[in-house]
Amino acid sequence: MSFQAGDIVRIVACADDPRAVGKTGRVLDEVPPGPLTDYRWTVDRISIWIAPVLCHTHELRKEN
């Protein structure tokens, strides 16, 4: 599955910050992630207390 910038996603797992699991956020990346981020998507707007996180595709589910 691929995401687009602005997609709302639910974080089902997150090695970067386990506090983000179960929360929703917005994908920031305008292009598919590459080696610089270890092929992880940048997800923002999770919580005021949680900074943007990097998540692999299998850790995210697209919200409707």
Predicted regions and their residues:
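Basic/aromatic-rich interaction segments and small domains that mediate binding to polyanionic partners
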Residues: 2-64
